[in-house]
């Protein structure tokens, strides 16, 4: 046993003196490898030169020594890892009070969705629209009830809407239409002309859809507002042609259905491939949205139109991007392309 104690003591001393991982692994192989010294001692137990009692006693002692060696090895390995980490932290130390530094190559461009948002707001601002904002976590009233969306409407299904865990009374807003409701409640009296951009959330994710995306919705409420080319059609047609910088761009309004507008329409533009492409939805504000239980605007006196567009989709069209997910990957090589 004295020989065993001597070997393990030498091994532990060698482990503690190791200066790097390479030396440490060599020491482990010398003592615990297939031909290591402690491994060799275990093999002597089966040479037939010991009685069963001696083999049991000496074997237990050798295993105890192996465990001591392994404990010392683990401690040294952890110490070397810690020393390596501290050295790296010291080398990469950053004073967070220092001013920020520009990205390599002077990259200062805004995100393409932000650039698209700014362009949309700029165009509508030029037509007299005010920017409005609201919370992203909405209650059932503002997100559904006030917009004439009944309790059994498919949009309320959990597979389409993210519910907040508070008894299913709040949701991550599924559109920016609640901003319009809040604005009308605060404004009280028309005329109202707003554009409401922001993040919205729906349970969807693929090359052309994201669970979080960006919308911009417009609202115009005043006496005598109509769907005709003097009002809704005129505003959106002018906007879409100026956005894509094409005075000859063909625009069509295709009958559709939305709970909060009547009549309603999908808006299409003619693509470069000669096919119609959907870019938004619109319609005349449903009289139920104006009623006393909602925003208390007299539907006999006032009319209004609303429209909505997907900013991410507009960015894809503007910059010829075919996969929506590229906007959320934070790849600088991709983002540097946009000015």
From Swiss-Prot:
Q: Which cofactor does it need?
A: Mg(2+)
UniProt GO cellular component terms:
cytoplasm
Q: Which GO terms describe its molecular function?
A: ATP binding; magnesium ion binding; phenylalanine-tRNA ligase activity; tRNA binding
Q: What Enzyme Commission number(s) appear in the record? A: 6.1.1.20
Q: Which domain of life is it from?
A: Bacteria
Principal EC category:
ligase
Which InterPro entries does this chain map to?
aa-tRNA-synth_II (IPR006195), aa-tRNA-synth_II/BPL/LPL (IPR045864), Phe-tRNA-synth_IIc_asu (IPR004529), Phe-tRNA_ligase_II_N (IPR004188), Phe_tRNA_ligase_alpha1_bac (IPR022911), Phenylalanyl-tRNA_Synthase (IPR002319), tRNA-bd_arm (IPR010978)
Compartment annotation? Cytoplasm
Q: How is the cofactor bound?
A: Binds 2 magnesium ions per tetramer.
A Pfam family assignment = Phe_tRNA-synt_N
Q: What is its main location?
A: cytoplasm
Q: Where does Mg(2+) bind?
A: 262
The record lists the catalysed reaction(s) as: tRNA(Phe) + L-phenylalanine + ATP = L-phenylalanyl-tRNA(Phe) + AMP + diphosphate + H(+)
Keywords noted in UniProt: Aminoacyl-tRNA synthetase, ATP-binding, Cytoplasm, Ligase, Magnesium, Metal-binding, Nucleotide-binding, Protein biosynthesis
GO biological process entries: phenylalanyl-tRNA aminoacylation
Describe its partners and assembly state: Tetramer of two alpha and two beta subunits.
> Which family is it part of?
Belongs to the class-II aminoacyl-tRNA synthetase family. Phe-tRNA synthetase alpha subunit type 1 subfamily.
NCBIfam families, sorted: pheS
The protein's name: Phenylalanine--tRNA ligase alpha subunit
Q: Which organism is it from?
A: Neisseria gonorrhoeae (strain ATCC 700825 / FA 1090)
